[in-house]
């Protein structure tokens, strides 16, 4: 059995009341911020405050019988290629690290939020998405937890 539950298993746990979005989000944040894990190379930004607020809101809605989508309450990350309002989108490049923060979310981010997904942070990527291998000399190259090549299944 896989030590890391699948998104399907986590969604089933939420639906059955075995776990809350707040519990899942705290577990995701803990793992992302663990200095012994890959979190420092995987995440370019962790937005714990916003994630905790979204998880609490999701749990409140679920308790009222409102489930917006199958993603309701599930912690997710967003590649540093997509704008998140109030955050700098670097696209994996140091050239953009001092760019002004995004004024609005990318449409895909709006859709995730509308679906009830909990965005815990932004993830590393190849500079300007120019490689399928996930290599990034500026922010580090994260390892794929399933021993495959980063950026795709090879």
List the predicted regions and their residue ranges:
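An N-terminal boundary/leader segment
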Residues: 1-53, 60-63
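Alpha-helical scaffold segments in soluble metabolic enzymes
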Residues: 9, 27, 57, 107, ...
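Residue-level detector of short coil/turn "hinge" positions at structural boundaries
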Residues: 20-21, 68, 119
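Short coil/turn segments at secondary-structure boundaries
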Residues: 26-27, 45, 70-72, 144
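Short, solvent-exposed polar/charged micro-motifs at secondary-structure junctions
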Residues: 52-55, 131
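Immediate post-signal peptide segment of exported/extracytoplasmic ligand-binding proteins
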Residues: 58-75
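Short glycine/serine-rich loop/turn segments
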Residues: 71-154
């Amino acid at each position: 059995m896989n030590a890391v539950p699948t998104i399907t298993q986590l969604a089933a746990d939420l639906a059955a009341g075995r776990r809350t979005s707040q519990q899942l989000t705290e577990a995701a944040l803990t793992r992302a911020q663990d200095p012994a894990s890959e979190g420092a190379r995987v995440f370019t930004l962790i937005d714990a405050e916003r994630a905790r607020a979204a998880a609490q809101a999701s749990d409140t809605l679920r308790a009222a019988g409102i489930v917006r989508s199958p993603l309701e309450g599930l912690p997710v990350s967003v590649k540093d290629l997509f704008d998140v309002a109030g955050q700098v989108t670097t696209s994996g490049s140091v050239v953009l690290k001092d760019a002004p923060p995004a004024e609005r979310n990318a449409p895909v981010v709006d859709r995730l939020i509308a679906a009830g997904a909990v965005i815990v942070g932004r993830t590393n990527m190849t500079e300007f998405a120019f490689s399928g291998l996930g290599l990034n000399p500026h922010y580090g190259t994260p390892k794929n937890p399933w021993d495959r090549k980063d950026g795709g299944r090879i």
